[in-house]
């Protein structure tokens, strides 16, 4: 029985090969065209990969030179620092405009935002953090960019905007590594608005859901003042 099965399978394979062989004989030109087209497509893919890697490497080298020039200047006055920052931002933007993929294209806005943030230029930093989050919503850094833009809004005393951004994080990125941070920041925002019920709700989420979080101590301290404020009002 086993031998018969093997023979049947062998016959099927042989018949299939014969069909292919007959097709090739009957359609030599078509077969040749298919083979040539396949080879051309394969070569095109290889060339594309090589070009992609070469261009991305060239862009990264250029990007690193821009950052080295910006960070490498020491003992300069504030006007010179501002000029260096402006030039670096312009150069990164130009590099991004000329690229359609790769590290620089994906992360340029985040780099610019960080440069502005480190100089306490919160309006500009917020703009670029949000640009990055809009362009790369699936990036690991997208929730961090939105969180930073919310902090920038706080520095700019745009508290309603801050709350909206933290709520956006809760809606879209609650499964990110920033979950405890999101709850803590929302608690802070509601505490600032004297919404004790909502503030306590978010603080409790940290204490019950993340008992080993680095935010627990800060949360307990804030809840203590919440209780004090509540008693004071009564």
Role assignments for model-derived ranges:
Residues 1-234:
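Acidic, polar-rich low-complexity tracts and alpha-helical solenoid repeat scaffolds
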